[in-house]
A protein has these predicted regions:
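Aromatic- and acidic-residue-enriched carbohydrate-binding clefts of CAZyme catalytic domains
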Residues: 57-106, 137-139
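Surface-exposed amphipathic alpha-helices with a cationic face
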Residues: 1-2, 110-124, 128
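Structural recognition of the beta-strand scaffold that forms the well-ordered cores
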Residues: 6-9, 47-52, 123-126
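Well-ordered, non-membrane alpha-helical segments in soluble/globular domains
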Residues: 25-37, 103-109
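Substrate-binding/active-site clefts of carbohydrate-active enzymes
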Residues: 125-139
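Boundary/entry segment of secreted carbohydrate-active catalytic domains
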Residues: 1-27
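Catalytic domains of carbohydrate-active enzymes, especially glycoside hydrolases
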Residues: 32-59, 77-78
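Active-site beta-loop-alpha junctions enriched in small/polar residues
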Residues: 11-13, 54-56, 128-132
Length: 139
């Protein structure tokens, strides 16, 4: 009998909310944290990782579309309450982890794809879009 496929679906923040799990040694967030996350998926026999790297803005490095980090600076208090279920310091720390990678010239999506391929996990991107009634018709 063929084994079941295991698909893990994660959004843009999946690897950024729990740094003590993915980078227990601390320090600026690094590509190693992304690899540690994918290692855990592989250990649990996940064979496909679908990640959504966007909301209304791209949460990945882009020169073509606006990104969540375009005007972000470390500790930017404008982001303190953006995710209301978390305390302000958690929101700021999560954004700073993205900035750590950006400053180290790490494209987290590309690095995650590399980690997936190294662990024989199929990397997929899932894209969120507004419902059709919210889109302009362009007519």
């Amino acid at each position: 009998m063929q084994e079941h496929r295991i698909i893990f679906n994660g959004d843009w923040g999946t690897m950024f909310w729990a740094p003590k799990l993915w980078q227990p040694e601390g320090g600026p967030y690094s590509a190693r944290a992304l690899h540690n996350f994918v290692d855990l998926l592989a250990e649990h026999r996940v064979d496909t990782f679908a990640i959504s790297p966007n909301t209304q803005l791209a949460w990945y490095p882009s020169k073509a579309v606006p990104t969540a980090l375009d005007e972000y600076t470390r500790g930017d208090q404008r982001w303190a309450k953006w995710f209301r279920s978390c305390p302000p310091e958690t929101n700021i720390a999560m954004m700073d982890r993205y900035l750590d990678l950006l400053e180290a010239d790490v494209d987290w999506m590309a690095e995650t794809v590399l980690a997936c391929k190294q662990r024989q996990i199929a990397p997929w991107a899932s894209v969120r879009a507004p419902p059709p009634e919210k889109c302009a018709t362009g007519a």
